[in-house]
């Protein structure tokens, strides 16, 4: 997700997303601004500071969130049961968790706090201008010079923006298309754009005639959260997600090649008993 104020700098090497790797040997002595206060923002801030950069961590919130309700979902029941909930129940769970904001891990905050990083809270970047080879971030009373800006601003949901999915995006069923307008609340725009997935992470086609082809594409990433929970975007649940994906693929491969497997069954002739076990029985 690229905040609007940074959009005109798309492709500029002075701005990158927190999901991109940092070239640590190029950070020493540089001014780095990290936007956001989620875990990835803190991790990037710490890595940059440890590489010798002067780091400013900027957040819109006036205080850091202290609670991570997502930790309450780290159970086998949630991992296996969330996909079985009704659509409205799934939406209610994730609405509440995100509305409460998710605190970065305690050890991550402790790591950042020890590195002399400047924390600027209650500040929203409303203008970005160039200052020589650097950028000047205007956040009201705060003016932050930066050689590199790292956006820890999360991800947006837009399959059409991905080259690999661009030709398929218009055929993919979204959550907006599965729920009536009355089910949605203000602020649900992002949830509406999530793809509505099948039980094995497969895309579901708007047109049933395209399902066989579209169902071959598995969406094993953050976009699966609303349909299947945290099976593809949360470390504690990753093993559950991998198993679900593997089982779904194995089942689909078998069904697709049923004729081959059935013929193999008909041809199977490996004897279990060779005749010497109890000769009078044969």
What positions do the PLM features span?
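Flavin (primarily FAD) cofactor-binding/catalytic cores of flavoenzymes
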Residues: 1-39, 43-282
């Amino acid at each position: 997700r690229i905040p609007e104020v940074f959009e005109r700098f798309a492709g500029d090497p002075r701005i990158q997303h927190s999901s991109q790797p940092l070239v640590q040997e190029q950070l020493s002595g540089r001014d780095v601004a990290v936007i956001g206060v989620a875990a990835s923002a803190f991790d990037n801030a710490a890595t940059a500071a440890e590489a010798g950069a002067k780091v400013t961590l900027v957040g819109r919130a006036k205080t850091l969130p202290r609670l991570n309700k997502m930790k309450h979902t780290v159970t086998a029941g949630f991992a296996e049961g969330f996909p079985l909930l009704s659509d409205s129940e799934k939406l209610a769970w994730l609405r509440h968790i995100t509305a409460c904001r998710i605190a970065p891990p305690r050890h991550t905050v402790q790591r950042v706090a020890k590195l002399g990083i400047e924390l600027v809270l209650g500040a929203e970047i409303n203008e970005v201008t160039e200052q020589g080879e650097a950028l000047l971030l205007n956040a009201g009373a705060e003016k932050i010079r930066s050689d590199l800006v790292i956006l820890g601003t999360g991800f947006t949901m837009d399959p059409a923006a991905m080259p690999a999915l661009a030709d398929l995006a218009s055929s993919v069923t979204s959550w907006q298309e599965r729920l009536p307008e009355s089910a949605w609340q203000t602020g649900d725009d992002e949830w509406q754009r999530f793809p509505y997935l099948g039980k094995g992470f497969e895309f579901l086609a708007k047109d049933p005639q395209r399902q066989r082809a579209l169902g071959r594409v598995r969406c094993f990433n953050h976009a699966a959260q609303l349909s299947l929970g945290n099976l593809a975007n949360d470390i504690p649940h990753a093993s559950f997600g991998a198993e679900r994906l593997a089982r779904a693929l194995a089942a689909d491969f078998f069904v697709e090649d049923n004729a081959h497997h059935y013929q193999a069954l008909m041809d199977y002739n490996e004897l279990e008993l060779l005749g010497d076990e109890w000769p009078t029985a044969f």
